[in-house]
Each structure stands twice: as structure tokens, then as C-alpha cells.
């Protein structure tokens, strides 16, 4: 399922850890709605930086989140957070791209 032109649901939910352990990391309908909104925000960041964005961590099921040692209040759990990387840019540069 394509959420936006450049971000798919599969990309926003993929986890090497979940795959390696055979864990289901499928979000529910509410989380999919949140991921869609998040993907739209990431499209705006992509336009500002002028480069593709790699999502290293998006939605996390409770099992995955617990295995990673994250808190239950993590926004990843509800599809409202993503860890991203942009080739050739550090986090500060990405953050300043909107200025």
C-alpha cells in the first residue's frame, strides 16, 4: 500500500528485528492513518532537503518496541514517529533544512 508518492506502508513498518524473529509488525487502522499523516510530513522534509529519505524505524508493535528497549509511550507505537536518514546529511543539517 502506497501512503504517499515516495513512502509505502511496507517501508514505514519494516523491521529487521521483527523479520529476523518472525514477529508480526502489522499496524491497526488507527496506526495506518497516523503513518499516512507522518508520510505526508516526510514528503515535505524530502522536498526541503531535495534528497530521498531512508526510514530506518517507523511503526513498532508492542513486542518489537519492548525488544528494542523503548518505552510504551514511544510515538513509534502509534505510527507517529520515524527515525530517518538522508545520504550526505547529518541530523542537524536535516533539521536546519527548513530555514
Regions found by a protein language model. Give the residues of each.
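Cell-envelope/glycan interface and biosynthesis
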Residues: 3-98
Amino acid at each position: 500500500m502506497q501512503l504517499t508518492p515516495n513512502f509505502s506502508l511496507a517501508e514505514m513498518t519494516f523491521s529487521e528485528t521483527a523479520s529476523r524473529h518472525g514477529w508480526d509488525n502489522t499496524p491497526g487502522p488507527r496506526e495506518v492513518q497516523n503513518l499516512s499523516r507522518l508520510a505526508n510530513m516526510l514528503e515535505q522534509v524530502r522536498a526541503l532537503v531535495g534528497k530521498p529519505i531512508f526510514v530506518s524505524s517507523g511503526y513498532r508493535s508492542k513486542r518489537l518496541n519492548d525488544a528494542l528497549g523503548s518505552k510504551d509511550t514511544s510515538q513509534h507505537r502509534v505510527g507517529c514517529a520515524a527515525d530517518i536518514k538522508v545520504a550526505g546529511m547529518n541530523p542537524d543539517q536535516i533539521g536546519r533544512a527548513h530555514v
